[in-house]
């Protein structure tokens, strides 16, 4: 009998043939790994999961919990909430049969133009790393693996597959590697390598996969590639890249077997990769190591024994974080998941401005004019591979009407946020075959023969790896009946990539080829081109609609098909829409305008071209504010946008992409039932010209991080420019006073304890985020003006004082100089409630370190 799980795993590796081992190192399909029944190894399922766990398919028939975006979670500054968020994600993964969650995304928000920032936490490495560590621990307590991504410096989307990032050592270690180190030291079982190159070497071949990842941080898990990121056989195999996704086709397979046999790649390198994969399988429960399991599967246990012994079960494994005994595997109910989503959404809502309008009285205003496309159809998540399909989305209109059943809530859609279509709601469609709500989807072969027919309940469909073999056409058919609020003429359309043919009542109305914006998977699937046609509709006379999509492009050949049937915003005069909305606002006690970004603005696959709100939303806000001085603006975006009217309205709330319960959460905040607990995890500029680090576009294939260690608020402080709202900013419904700052001498392990008292001086319970920053103005080396060193979210009743202790680890005093070094002497310690609101100051004296 072997003494440890690792010894048993090594024995199993030695008993496999080269072909068996190599086969394990490329995915079986888009979302799962290869099984090896002979050793009790089942396939492991991987799924995107930064803000909800999709599972192996996007399918409304198996919906997912849509949690608030990563920026919303980061805005809570609450590690306990991050832990609970991770626990719910693990429960969702188990419900979906998922072993590996592909998250958290812990790239930094280097420039506010980054198109995927909604999926990442912050511009600050410490805040990002602390949240990531809490999430990773919570997910893995349930024997589901977490996957910090994208390692490393994939902080942009433009040319992400080919761009080379050029940066100095200090920026690399102090900023971009730091969150990954925190996640790995928290016990992460996987790390995802990025598409981009760093210093001329693509990340799936980069020596950074070895040092510092494995040599300095002791990472013993699996390095999985981003999808289709591995481009080579020998170079990637000789690097510490372990698993190629997706499969079964890839650059390894038979070519890697040949490379090993020729001596170009040592077999020992393959053995190490397989060992890591088996270790992951054992951790998530995908590998049965018992003798009986091996014998039941026909495996020769003597062969295992000949390599050092037989397999074992339930013996200690060398784990950064111990595998739990299963006692933490209790399911989270649907209700509990939705309540957590609601809590996080409220806790992450940032009150940017309040002139006394909020909170409303518990009974609410008598009449409320709710204005804006996002008030009716909120963006609950960003676009791209992380998209999930929730069972239900609560809009602000829904939330207010539920919270205030006696109030008069009137609605105006405002102005279009973007071009494109909104998927037809289930209630407006009838499957012509069954007569039930929904549509009929059929895959046809080249001769028109039916390969698959199914009823679907959503008009936005994504097929990933589930397209039948031989399919040449996807056909959608439904009977469309417009809703009661639809105009007499609608623009009915389709979004997709490929040749599109649409018929209405048997007449061809569209026959064209559509392309997709952005790059590869994310944008091509979630922001494709649109074709639409105006159709006169009568609610008493529904119309038959048939759409056919030819499956001829590269994505379809890879089994990736996406199509949406919906209505396009009518091409009305924006000025007329603004006037209508303002007139409505003038009749109400108060007005709420919801503004935001669209899927063509914030999505995986491309970066933003401007920070301005799309369309005529700025004009809309100003007109409504003139018509009703009690105007509250809600910002529904994943990252910073410009708010030029911010001083012209009564209140501004930032809800990010708030998840499926965002409407309930926002109603809770407006009515004061819940504190707007958020504080900014990123700096919000007043103008685009003020932003010190803006470009996300490579020059001749190279993106140069010329700013070094000065990104985010560090860059703003260095430039001496005042933003609209600084990092860490956020108001509440109470007032606070911080006092009694004390800074300890370094403890034996180098930790410096910062203590203070936080007193709620307001008339109601509230939340505050106490933030501690360091500075070293007399430093002999280049440093930021200030940098975040620690934080704590605290709550207190009216008049209550609470003690706060924030421990500063030695690393926050250190800088990178070929290794971690600490400049001896006094560091200024600043405590307060944002990077610029720091009323308390002390000093920490530290010795040299390295």
In which residue ranges do the predicted regions lie?
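Short beta-strand elements
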Residues: 837-850
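Glycoside hydrolase catalytic-domain context in secreted enzymes
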Residues: 1-816, 821-836
